[in-house]
Structures are given as structure tokens and as C-alpha cells.
Amino acid sequence: MTPVEEIIKKDIFRETPLRYLGYANEVGEAFRSLVKPVVVKFSYVVAFGYVAADSIDKGLQEYIKTHSTSTEKTKKVAIAAVDTVLWQTFASVLIPGFTINRFCFFSNLLLQKSTKLPTNMRKWTVTCLGLATIPFIVHPIDSFVEEAMDKTARKIYNEPTISNKE
């Protein structure tokens, strides 16, 4: 495979730094104590925009493939898009958002009870801890969601793991 073919085959939404756009809401959650609620809400808009872009991309990739019937094509496009919406919603938004939110909440609680840090310093410490946590949760959550979907939703529509398809 040539370098150009490798680049074309690479999933830009899951195998490049663009993947971190799906984690915009985690950044928002980490900054929750320092910013207005509208900023946190906007971070969710960015994350769901990423989910939508990846889902459209996966649907279009399936659409341009050759299928034996239009019914099969419609089914395959729908499955590709829905599978991506489910995967990205859980792996990029819901689970990591909850994880960072709770991590920051309990970090703040711990710092309040165990230190005498000024409020502003405590908030910045919690934010930094939340941001530092993000890179460590990406791959475990991605793997968990992949496995969970293989055991649940993908059995319903009888499709192999999307990332393992050719």
C-alpha cells in the first residue's frame, strides 16, 4: 500500500487528533467551575457536531460502495450511520463527559475538605486535574464501547465491528 493509499484509508475521525473534537465537552466539563454555563453547553454542541460529521462520513463511505440492490444499499448506509452515532455518542460524549464531570466534582470535594487552598486556586487545580485526565480515559472508553456494542446493538443489526470492516 502506498503512503497516499494509507492516508486515504485512515479514519480521520478516529485515528487522528481530530478525534479529540469529540472530547470538547470534557474540556467544557473540566472548565465548568471557571466558565459560564453557556460555555459548557457550547462544548457539547462541538462534540455532537463531531458525532454528526463522523456519522455522515461513515454513511457516505457506505453509500459510494457498490451494492446488489437499492434496498441493501439503504440498509447498509443506515446501519453505518446509526452505528457511528451510537458509538460516538457513548465513546465521545456521554461516558467521558460523565467521567470528567464526576472526577472534577469529587476532586473539588476532596480539595475543599483536605486543603485550605483559596477558592480560585482550588478551581484551577480541579480544572487542570480534569484536563490531565482526558488523555488517559480515551482508549479505555473507546475499547469498552466497542466491546459493548459488539455484544448488544451490533448483534441486533448483525454487523461486524465497523472498525474491523474492510
Swiss-Prot record:
Keywords: Apoptosis, Membrane, Mitochondrion, Mitochondrion inner membrane, Transmembrane, Transmembrane helix
Membrane topology, record value: Multi-pass membrane protein
Location in or out of the cell: Mitochondrion inner membrane
Parts of the chain that traverse the membrane: 33-53, 78-98, 125-145
Name assigned to this protein: Mitochondrial fission process protein 1
GO biological process: apoptotic process; mitochondrial fission
Family designation: Belongs to the MTFP1 family.
One GO CC term, this protein: mitochondrial inner membrane
InterPro entries: Mitochondrial_18_kDa_protein
Key word Cytoplasm present: no
Source species, domain of life: Eukaryota
Species of provenance: Caenorhabditis elegans
Function comment: Involved in the mitochondrial division probably by regulating membrane fission. Loss-of-function leads to apoptosis.
